[in-house]
Curated annotation (Swiss-Prot):
This is Probable G-protein coupled receptor 152. The lineage of its organism: Eukaryota, Metazoa, Chordata, Craniata, Vertebrata. Disulfide bonds join 104-182. It comes from the Eukaryota. Keywords: Cell membrane, Disulfide bond, G-protein coupled receptor, Membrane, Receptor, Transducer, Transmembrane, Transmembrane helix. Residues 1-25, 322-470 are annotated as: Disordered. Residues 1-33, 87-105, 170-194, 279-281 are extracellular. Residues 325-335, 348-414 have a biased composition (Polar residues). The gene is GPR152. GO terms for biological process: G protein-coupled receptor signaling pathway.
């Protein structure tokens, strides 16, 4: 605004704006910043959680009408609180706008879309409840099933179209010396656009107020005659809570808008009413912050869903703690390997039948030597190495059958039928002692074939899978 236009408007008693003429008289300060920051820190996560809960409920098909309403309302409140971040930035700079014209237009457009969508959505909800209360027999049968989806989509489209002027007219310009402010309308188009803003906001609010009063009066008159279903009572309780809070906290802003339009060209009254608009806008922010908590208090389904989500999250956190995890499987594998057994015996033992594993004597395993195992204790040899039991009995049949076979029958009862049921290792090793002229050479400890017969290298790879019963 140049000085010539300002002088002409000052001479006629009209001014383009009535907010501020001096940087020192800026009414908003530190307490406003603290209040707005507290609302943002409380309201943004709450509305985000409400949108996620309502989206999950609508995705699973539970309470679709209420879920779509709460999802749209939570998104509207979230955007309205996000637009307040620009207001905090402006307050911190003492009314100076440091972001330029593009950010100024985006700020007013975001504010207009979020404010109009919430207002139109609650007006449609109030009208729907009023028709349901006044025509309880006719309206439910004639209402389309997809009406909530159509209403929510139409509300967002209408709010976007209604906020298009805020993408065109706002501008960041020098107002007082080097003070740059973000103005929504200038003098030439302010009156017409202010009237559009007031009518576009006041008429839906008036429809909401009238329908809400009629619905509450009808509900009080018919509540003693008939009992509603639990789902209808829950939806009515949530809608009543939201609409009542909206009427109480947004009515001052609508009244301040009407008075501001009436005294638009009055300097002092316009300035006071501008301050009234600013602080009544804080009430709208408070309503957007409290709306998720009011919905949770009024809806039992949302409280149950929130408790289940929080309990699942707490259980996941407890599982991720280092002290709560005990690796049971690796400990079982370490115990089953047996540190005192040689490596080929451990492989053969892991492939045996679990029925024969508990019969191994753990006290005799550390003393068993693979090279001198037949001399230490021939009777305990089938227990320490069940895979080599058929070979010892076949190769040393003339000398050790009379001693080792009865003891193997009395001490070890289960491996005997297991060895007889798998004849493949015994049948393959049976021609070997018949080819040697001296079968007693196996009892000599200095002979290399005896040590090779018990050593890991003499065990064929194909004999390990057939060592135990399958």
């Amino acid at each position: 605004m140049d000085t010539t236009m300002e002088a002409d408007l000052g001479a006629t008693g009209h001014r383009p704006r009535t907010e501020l003429d001096d940087e020192d008289s800026y009414p908003q300060g530190g307490w406003d910043t603290v209040f707005l920051v507290a609302l943002l820190l409380l309201g943004l996560p709450a509305n985000g959680l409400m949108a996620w809960l309502a989206g999950s409920q609508a995705r699973h098909g539970a309470g679709t009408r209420l879920a779509l309403l709460l999802l749209s309302l939570a998104l509207s409140d979230f955007l309205f609180l996000a637009a307040a971040a620009f207001q905090i930035l402006e307050i911190r700079h003492g009314g100076h706008w440091p972001l330029g014209t593009a950010a100024c237009r985006f700020y007013y457009f975001l504010w207009g879309v979020s404010y109009s969508s919430g207002l139109f959505l609650l007006a449609a909800l109030s009208l729907d409840r009023c028709l349901l209360a006044l025509c309880p027999h006719w309206y439910p049968g004639h209402r389309p099933v997809r009406l909530p989806l159509w209403v929510c989509a139409g509300v967002w489209v209408l709010a976007t179209l209604f906020s298009v002027p805020w993408l065109v007219f706002p501008e960041a310009a020098v107002w007082w010396y080097d003070l740059v402010i973000c103005l929504d309308f200038w003098d030439s188009e302010e009156l017409s656009l202010r009237m559009l803003e007031v009518l576009g906001g006041f008429l839906p609010f008036l429809l909401l107020l009238v329908c809400h009063v009629l619905t509450q009066a009808t509900a009080c008159r018919t509540c003693h005659r008939q009992q509603q279903p639990a789902a209808c009572r829950g939806f009515a309780r949530v809608a009543r809570t939201i609409l009542s809070a909206y009427v109480v906290l947004r009515l001052p802003y609508q009244l301040a808008q009407l008075l501001y339009l009436a005294f638009l060209w009055d300097v002092y009254s316009g300035y006071l009413l501008w301050e009234a608009l600013v602080y009544s806008d804080y009430l709208i922010l408070l309503n957007s912050c409290l709306s998720p908590f009011l919905c949770l208090m009024a809806s039992a389904d949302l409280r149950t869903l929130l408790r289940s989500v929080l309990s699942s999250f707490a259980a996941a956190l407890c599982e991720e703690r280092p002290g709560s995890f005990t690796p049971t499987e690796p400990q079982t594998q370490l115990d089953s390997e047996g540190p005192t057994l040689p490596e080929p015996m451990a492989e053969a033992q892991s492939q045996m039948d679990p029925v024969a594993q508990p019969q191994v004597n753990p006290t005799l395993q550390p003393r068993s030597d693979p090279t001198a195992q037949p001399q230490l204790n021939p009777t305990a040899q089938p227990q320490s190495d069940p895979t080599a039991q058929p070979q010892l009995n076949l190769m040393a049949q003339p000398q050790s059958d009379s001693v080792a076979q009865p003891q193997a029958d009395t001490n070890v009862q289960t491996p005997a039928p297991a060895a007889s049921s798998v004849p493949s290792p015994c049948d393959e090793a049976s021609p070997t002692p018949s080819s040697h002229p001296t079968p007693g050479a196996l009892e000599d400890p200095a002979t290399p074939p005896a040590s090779e017969g018990e050593s890991p290298s003499s065990t064929p790879p194909e004999a390990a899978p057939g060592a135990g019963p399958t």
